Amino acid sequence: MFPFQPMYPMQPMPYRNPFAAPRRPWFPRTDPFLAMQVQELTRSMANLTFKQRRDAPPEGPSAKKPKKEASQKQKGGGQGKKKKNQGKKKAKTGPPNPKAQNGNKKKTNKKPGKRQRMVMKLESDKTFPIMLEGKINGYACVVGGKLFRPMHVEGKIDNDVLAALKTKKASKYDLEYADVPQNMRADTFKYTHEKPQGYYSWHHGAVQYENGRFTVPKGVGAKGDSGRPILDNQGRVVAIVLGGVNEGSRTALSVVMWNEKGVTVKYTPENCEQWSLVTTMCLLANVTFPCAQPPICYDRKPAETLAMLSVNVDNPGYDELLEAAVKCPGRKRRSTEELFKEYKLTRPYMARCIRCAVGSCHSPIAIEAVKSDGHDGYVRLQTSSQYGLDSSGNLKGRTMRYDMHGTIKEIPLHQVSLHTSRPCHIVDGHGYFLLARCPAGDSITMEFKKDSVTHSCSVPYEVKFNPVGRELYTHPPEHGVEQACQVYAHDAQNRGAYVEMHLPGSEVDSSLVSLSGSSVTVTPPVGTSALVECECGGTKISETINKTKQFSQCTKKEQCRAYRLQNDKWVYNSDKLPKAAGATLKGKLHVPFLLADGKCTVPLAPEPMITFGFRSVSLKLHPKNPTYLTTRQLADEPHYTHELISEPAVRNFTVTEKGWEFVWGNHPPKRFWAQETAPGNPHGLPHEVITHYYHRYPMSTILGLSICAAIATVSVAASTWLFCRSRVACLTPYRLTPNARIPFCLAVLCCARTARAETTWESLDHLWNNNQQMFWIQLLIPLAALIVVTRLLRCVCCVVPFLVMAGAAAGAYEHATTMPSQAGISYNTIVNRAGYAPLPISITPTKIKLIPTVNLEYVTCHYKTGMDSPAIKCCGSQECTPTYRPDEQCKVFTGVYPFMWGGAYCFCDTENTQVSKAYVMKSDDCLADHAEAYKAHTASVQAFLNITVGEHSIVTTVYVNGETPVNFNGVKLTAGPLSTAWTPFDRKIVQYAGEIYNYDFPEYGAGQPGAFGDIQSRTVSSSDLYANTNLVLQRPKAGAIHVPYTQAPSGFEQWKKDKAPSLKFTAPFGCEIYTNPIRAENCAVGSIPLAFDIPDALFTRVSETPTLSAAECTLNECVYSSDFGGIATVKYSASKSGKCAVHVPSGTATLKEAAVELTEQGSATIHFSTANIHPEFRLQICTSYVTCKGDCHPPKDHIVTHPQYHAQTFTAAVSKTAWTWLTSLLGGSAVIIIIGLVLATIVAMYVLTNQKHN
């Protein structure tokens, strides 16, 4: 690589110590007799350890050569070169290895890896082959005292004891099982349901487990491996292999495994095949044969081989037959040739190109199709020329071959140019397909120059870069983050997509016709046949020739037509080529360069500058590319927004206590929560109180201030009016009678008239004499009151103590509580039992999964329009055959094709007919790019809980259904059912690109053109395709072979453009949406009932725990509505040291600690959260209670990045200071009113008394 040798630094000189080395320490020598005894004991133990039954050694040379052979080799080392050569010859002519003669045994890997060695060692006594006709058809393994064998594997277990067992069938899991004898249970595998993502081991090496799927590299594992176990690092079975399916570069395995309950679960990927050695049979001339062993092959009988492939084109073993037919027995091929062997069955062709250098032409490089659906900027072209093969059909890399008027020529690929708006970079070619990377443009042109002639072809196609993610970038960035995407694979591995082939039709070749003297001579190419049709002097000639022949009846070249016939090569089923007459033999070959899942580097927009305000967030955005901004509220109504930001902008949003989330470009989501904070001081002066509450409760504050102002105004007005009224009343008598004067004391004494009420006896006597019904009613009122009071006393004195005692007694065994269904919020409580210390219980849900039951309705993707080569009949009529393909259309057109390239095609002008057929099929990339339509039903809930009961902790998974218990340390826990049946998924959902959408898709079989579901299939690989694309055939243009049509655009593509943000960004309650399986996690909605059954052993006697004799609680610091923003200090005196549970029975405060350590005398610090401005709660420490109360201040931070885990219940939202100022205000108004009323009363008494006196 470099022109010069690298220079390495010289080794440093060894360090020399100038001082003499110290003497070696002396140790006493051991007794030789004792050493001999130790060696003998070691030798005996080694014999006992290794003298066990061992399997037959693997094939191949041993790890170490025998000493004898090594010594012979050393002796022969000094011999001459001649003897060495003789020794080699003798070795070649020596007796054959008996193991090498046994062709039935599979050659094992000479150097198996560590995983393979471990599995082979564990499989030796626990896995047994199933033999069928002397071959291993599969395997049976013994797991957990049971024998498991795949039900689809036929044969007999190679063990007499196990073969005699009577098995039971479980068709749902494709397994047969039986209990093994007691003496064999010691050698069985153990199984486990624990399957963390990572790598596991099986017979062929490593198995990757990710997203609930087991995968291996492609080519690892094949038929005959059904029944093999997959093991973890501890040698436990995690799954049993049943089959597999190739998915690009990896193979997905069909397995049977176990869930957390120990219940068997089967996972089968789509289009999976069973891995037993059941032979797939194919057909040839009414004779069946194994598809992998055809009686003929292409190199020996090409025409017959194509006919055989056509007969079995729909056979499940077509791929095996195709591979075996191309690879003749006895011929070895290089591994690189495997990629190109299929397309040796085909040849290039010439086809019509709509835009050549000068108008339309029949081009050797006609472009059939262009696809650019990946996210990597690559383009896949399908052309009439071929790549990777030379003109003879042999392998030749970086070469293009093409058809030039019947002659196949080749050209180096670097002489072929491809460009859009600028030149493209050609990556590779395979068969009819070419992979290139092109810049953006509205058309794509391919051209090459040969013998000073330039051949080109252009087609209109908008080539553009398809970005992945939430930023619309135009070029892949140098730095960023990796994101899942779809890219075109740069290899030609078989991926399940096919391109249809058929025998080529007859093509007129004027070069075959020549004039020799006065007669016409037709010369067919060597090894091919030609059909000759002539009209000479009223004589019609039609015959097939394979060698040169003269036709003396004809004297002009225009009187004869020569058609090239070829039945040993296929061509692409193009609408630009005529169809062969009669029954056309068709086939299919694999499409290379398909879309595959990959990782793409996507850019990251600059982080927004965030400014926090009171319950608000301001984002200042500076995108480099158009970037999506999506927000939602983490409440029951998400109120999501979705906006594409192209220019610098500022966006303001409201944040509530329930949370708010925003996603900027390809950055991860960020969440913020508002705190109950506000300016001002709830415990300060009136203006500070008003400012504080105005920001917290603006409407309530305005309403309260308005009421207070109205009361004050009314009070002042009423007092003023009463004062004026009293003044007028006082002055009026004096104005009328100036000399009248009444003493004030007399007026006061005379104003109070005397009155005497009746006694109780007199009232009852009056009722008895005048109204006896009312008498009895009055008499029964005290009796009824006495009965009510008696019942209340009975309830208070009897029922409540009974319930308390019963609850205490039941707490010894059962305890029921309810916790919020919100991940991360810890729930603390205690169990009080008479005679025992309180038992603390702490529960923290780490994850809550909501998994709906889904049913796949259908799969939809891009469609591809298939067009049969037009069937042409000269001078005659045709009819359409019955249609059976999806959305198939057929029409017959007359008066077409009077001419074709190379001379006239038909002798007639208007009597010619063409049958055009077009239909719809799934695109080649449907396997990678498709959407799945599901119907969702009832959801199950799983909660991952971190539970602490006393001093025992466990992390467990609980099914929240109210039925499934979980046992740990003797504690039995039952959770559920959830308090609400809410789910973020609608009845109809769509899964696409790893995201879920609520979408009301059409039912199966009811798709509309141009809408989602225009093509529908039950699965990606199934053949039950429904299509409705408004396909209409148009009349072909005279003189050109093609099938024009019109069609609605892809509904799948339109849905991808118009779809709203997925549930990942719009789900209520902050749900996190995932796939595989479809589920919602950590939805903060509802509550989970919990029921504990606690054994007596976990309780502690009261005598063994401390008892507080004196306790005092002080709030050192208190910030309300903040995450454990309160600090309480409890000073105490205890009977002894120990550990005590702490708890607040009311919902006023939530404690962070579940228990505290106590000494005989000291203080304990406890952190708590509260939403109360003036918290006052009883704190229970062991069996004692202490009251804590004080004032709390609002938090300083308006916005925080974590939810508040404080208590949501509180008793007072208004501070005592505010109430004091309010009562003072109302109290002052009341004093004014009272003074006015007193004055008015005095005046009224005075006036009335004066009038009476007068």
From Swiss-Prot:
A motif (Nuclear localization signal) lies at residues 64-68. Residues 276-287 are annotated as: Functions as an uncleaved signal peptide for the precursor of protein E3/E2. Keywords: Capsid protein, Clathrin-mediated endocytosis of virus by host, Cleavage on pair of basic residues, Disulfide bond, Eukaryotic host gene expression shutoff by virus, Eukaryotic host transcription shutoff by virus, Fusion of virus membrane with host endosomal membrane, Fusion of virus membrane with host membrane, Glycoprotein, Host cell membrane, Host cytoplasm, Host gene expression shutoff by virus, Host membrane, Host mRNA suppression by virus, Host nucleus, Host-virus interaction, Hydrolase, Inhibition of host mRNA nuclear export by virus, Lipoprotein, Membrane, Palmitate, Phosphoprotein, Protease, RNA-binding, Serine protease, T=4 icosahedral capsid protein, Transmembrane, Transmembrane helix, Viral attachment to host cell, Viral attachment to host entry receptor, Viral envelope protein, Viral penetration into host cytoplasm, Virion, Virus endocytosis by host, Virus entry into host cell. Residues 112-126 are annotated as: Ribosome-binding. A motif (Supraphysiological nuclear export signal) lies at residues 41-48. Changing K51E: Non-cytopathic, incapable of inhibiting host transcription. The record marks W275, S276, R334, S335, A757, E758, A812, Y813 as: Cleavage. The active site is at H152 (charge relay system), D174 (charge relay system), S226 (charge relay system). The modification Phosphoserine is found at S124. This is Structural polyprotein. It comes from Venezuelan equine encephalitis virus (strain Trinidad donkey) (VEEV).
